[in-house]
Amino acid sequence: MLRLAAFLRGMNLGRRRITNDDLRAHVEALGFTDVATFRASGNVILTAPDDGALEDAARRLATGLSEALAYDVPVFARSAEQVRAMAAFEPFSADELAASTGKPQVMLLVQAPKAAARRAALALAPADDLFVFEAKELHWLPSVGLSQTELDYKALAKAIGHATVRTKGTIELIAAKHFGG
């Protein structure tokens, strides 16, 4: 059995509203077990019914949820080990964290970007923001709150592909609560 976290993009934004109970029921109807949700922002912890690849579980979830909800549901899946690694990774120094009024963010990507895409993304970072790539994530320390950032999300998506964003604190809480991290 494969235990994983699925980070769903665009949940509970605009008109795309779903309760955690309904989301859990849809995921269980797709054959996943031990389903738990964390906050109302599309964080689902689950066990896949077989030991297939993580990508297979993500694809099955994305297809099934998109059909059930009648809108596209991009899924960014990570194994328990990957979630613990994201939570433990500390890309920013104490001084950098203290100098920022923004919260550390983790952008989950479908795949690790190639060198040219990384360079393009780094060039898009607003002044005083910090970007650090690690595996299939872009760790971001905005110098201001997200509502004030000058980051061009569309240009960033063009450079590195679509992503979903969670605070580092959310990743840490999921790791601690669901994966013994």
Model regions and ranges:
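Surface-exposed, charge/polar-rich loops and edge strands
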Residues: 2-181
